[in-house]
Every structure is written in C-alpha cells, then in structure tokens.
C-alpha cells in the first residue's frame, strides 16, 4: 500500500514538473516573440527617422530662407558704401545701361562691356554723333539718333553694323537680337526689320495719312512679330492706330503682313513695349494690353482720369505716375501687373527727374537724391548725395551703379 502511494506521488510530481516545464517553455516562447516584435518596431522607427530627418532639415532650411527673404524685403537702408570707384570716366559724353549682369558703357566713338568691379571685359569702336541704346536680355542695339549708323551687339561684342539711307528716329531690339528701326525719309517714313548681324529682313514704307506717322516700335521675344504705334489726324481729331506685323508663316498671306490692328479715336499712344508674352500700349489716358504670340488681341484696357506724367515698366509690371495738387501728397504712383491687375497705389513726395524699373525694383532720382522701392511699394532707401547724379540703376543683390559728375561708383546699401 505504501508503495502504491509513493508511485502516485511520483506521478503527480512528474505531471506538475512537466506542466511547469511546458508553462516555462510557453513563457519563453512568448518572450521571444515579444522581443522579435520589439525589434521590428525599433527597425520601423529607425526607418521612419531616416526618412523624417532629411525632410525636417529641408523644411528648416526653407523656413530659414523664407525668413531671411522676408527680413531683407522689409529691411530699410539709410546709408551706402562705395565698393568700387572710377574717377577717370567721362560721364558727360558717356552713357551706361545694364546688359547680361554687367554694365554696357557707350559714347560717340566706343562701346565696352564692364563688370561690377568696373573692369573692361571688351571694347570696340565706331563713329556716331548722338548714340542711343536699347537693351533686351543679352542683346542691344546702339543707333545714331538723327544719323544713319547702327550697331548690333550681344554680351560678347558687336555682331553687325548698318548704314541706313535715311535718318534714324528710333531703334528697338528683341531678346533674339532682331531689331527694328524707324527711319525719316521726309514725305515718307520707313520701318526696317533687321537680323542680329545687321542684314535686312524687311522694309515697310509708311505714309503720314495712311496708316500715319510711326511714334514707336516694339518687338516680340520670338523675333517674328513687330508692333508699331501710328498717329494721324482724322477730322481734326488725333487718332492712334496699333498694328501688329508678323514676318513668319502666319503673316505671309496678309496685306503688308499686318495680322491685327486697333484704332483709338482721340487717343495718343507715345510708347509701346513688349512685356514677355504680352504687349502694352501706353496711352495718354491709361494703357491697353495685348496677348497672343502670333496674332495679338486686345486683353484689357485700363483708363485713368488724371494726367499721366511718367511711365515705367519691366516684363512683369506697368507703372504710372500722376501729379497731385496737395503739397503733402505731390505724386501718386500706381503699379499694375502685366495682365493689368492693380498691385498697389501710393503717394510720395520725391521731386524725381527719372523713374524706372531696375532688376525688379523701382528706382528714382534727381540731381542730388536717390530713392529705391521694392515691387510692393515699400521704401528700401532714400538719401542725398554730394555732387550731381547723372544716372542710377541696380546691378544685382543690393548693389547699384551710381554715375556722378565726378566719376562712376558701384555702391552697396547699408
């Protein structure tokens, strides 16, 4: 009997030990699974961090850039530092303009390209009496106003020359280097169209009665479409006619290659210009915008009641200035987009003699004062200078060319 109880106890002990062993093995197996799961979670987190880290770095960098841009846009300056100066310049007979990130310097006998350190990149000679330049992108034309000579050039130098049969009234150039000139032939005027090398593409004789006297000419970026503003008198009323010529395939079957034209009774259009893909006719009562690469159409007309005393523009903006009767608010400036939408209107009191768009900024000056506004109309700089200001325009980030009667300076606002 005793042996029987012993055997039963042994069996029970063995079952208990086996149960504990199975429980332990099960627990160990569960612990191993949890460990594997933990390893998977950690690996996923590491992968997520690897993805998020560069994204976070990029977002921080973008934020810093935007913050810096906003700071610089809102920052105003009250002084400037002269970085480079040249007192050997003949600023009386020499003129300056911006070309391809550098300075185009020209006079009656020479044209040269100068960098921002006032070092000459190249220089070439010609012979003119009254040189006037027009620049578009990397191309320029210099014409002898009331003379018969023109030179075509790009950032590398002169690409062609022309000797015209009649006196040059005005010359314009496109981004592709195509150029147009209005020539005065006495009873008739001519509008000639040239390649970058100076070769004649087309010539068009006009009559003062039909379509009128050409006031201005402008060229599209594609180098194919030419815009001309004519003026004539109809029944004692001054009338303007805007014509678009197409020298490509689209215009070959049209009379005189005119693909579209618009007449404005009682309106004077002294100035026209291409603004990127759009064109604008600056009128004495506002402006009209045209759109269309091959056959331009009227897009929008903005009319104003006040007398316009100044206009300025670039590819994205059109600016008008009006004179007010108030001593506290002498002038009103309105700036529109190239689609004709008003961006801002503001009063100002600076007695300027020149106002222009320069590298996305509005600059104005008189003989002793300079002023710079950003494209939102906020004043960036206003100050007086010693000496007589001859010219002033933007060269790049916070740098300007200041032409004085005593010499030429590259300045930085501070």
Where do the protein language model's features map onto the residues?
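Hydrophobic membrane-insertion alpha-helices, especially the h-region
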Residues: 53-70
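Solenoidal tandem-repeat scaffolds enriched in leucines and small polar residues
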Residues: 189-282
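Repeated scaffold domains used in trafficking and secretory/extracellular systems
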Residues: 88-98, 127-138, 166-177, 209-219, ...
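N-terminal targeting leaders characterized by basic, low-complexity, disordered sequences
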Residues: 1-32
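Structured, soluble extracytoplasmic/luminal domains of envelope-associated proteins
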Residues: 121-175, 299-302, 309-335
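Short loop/turn segments that connect beta-strands within beta-propeller blades
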Residues: 115-117, 154-157, 194-199, 247-250, ...
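Structural motif
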Residues: 110-112, 148-152, 187-193, 234-246, ...
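Aromatic (tryptophan-biased) beta-strands that constitute blades/sheets of beta-rich domains
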Residues: 75-94, 115, 119-128, 158-164, ...
